[in-house]
Structures are given as C-alpha cells and as structure tokens.
C-alpha cells in the first residue's frame, strides 16, 4: 500500500514449472490475509491449463467455472469480487467465436445460482476481451498487453470495460522481498 499499489492479482489454482521444479502458483489463505492486512484488495485469476486454443470449449467452461468458484470460496475471496478467467493464448477472431465465447458461456452457466456469487472477468488480448465482454459474458477485462505480438492486440483498441492493463514486468524490491511484478 505504501508503494502506491491498491490491488493484488493472484491465481486461485495451479502450478508453474514441471517435474522437480513444479511449485504451486495458487494464493494461500495466509497470503490473502496478508493482502487484506496491508489494506489492499485482491482480484483472483483462474488459469489451470496449458493455454492452447482447443482447451476453450463450453464443457471446459462448465468445469472451470465450478473449480474457480470452489477455490475462491474455500480461500475466502470476498463475495462480489471478480474472478478473471484467463485466455492466455493468441486467438484469431474466428477462434474467439468458436472457442472463447462458448467457454465463457459455460462459465456463466456453471456460476448460475451459486449461493456465494463472484463476478466474471476475462484476462486476454484486447480483441478476445472485447468480444467476450460484448457478448455480456464478462463484466471486466484484465488486458494482456505484454503480449505485443498477439494478433488480438495488434490494431485493436483496449476494451471499454478494462480494469487492469498488463504491459510491463519488472523485479520489485521491497524492505525484505524481491519478486517479479507486472504493471
């Protein structure tokens, strides 16, 4: 908070690395508590896949919607917060139509009627975020603008519902910590 930040974006599930170097990337209850104790807010990110276009289907959206909901609830993410579902691959416009939009329809269906409600957001390229949001399937966009070579970022405007725009990563050095930080 003292460094000027107000939000912390963290993954709900998953691992980075593979084999003996695999380590969890998921936020812990202790980490969430520390975020709140520091006066910060959290936004949750759901990405539990090796992002390829074929992953994104209606059926996968149903499954991921339930997994993300359960992870957020079990972690203690406050009701009403966004979960940003990641579409972290370069989709051509026709693939957004054929894959990303059905995936988010599955997420919407999976979250219908849940007793603790989270809002659906999207992480992805400018075009993917815009198209999914224009379908009414995401209320907020976390734009992956660091992926400057993605066709979905080239020549497309930033979505009107953008909340976060990831455009740079650097090593943050604090009083007793160093870590990669996306801006």
Mark where each language-model region is.
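Extracellular/periplasmic catalytic domains that process cell-envelope and extracellular macromolecules
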Residues: 1-3, 36-37, 76-79, 114, ...
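Structural recognition of the beta-strand scaffold that forms the well-ordered cores
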Residues: 6-11, 41-46, 81-86, 119-123, ...
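Active-site beta-loop-alpha junctions enriched in small/polar residues
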Residues: 12-15, 47-50, 88-90, 123-129, ...
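Functionally critical loop-and-helix segments that line ligand-binding/catalytic clefts
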Residues: 129-183
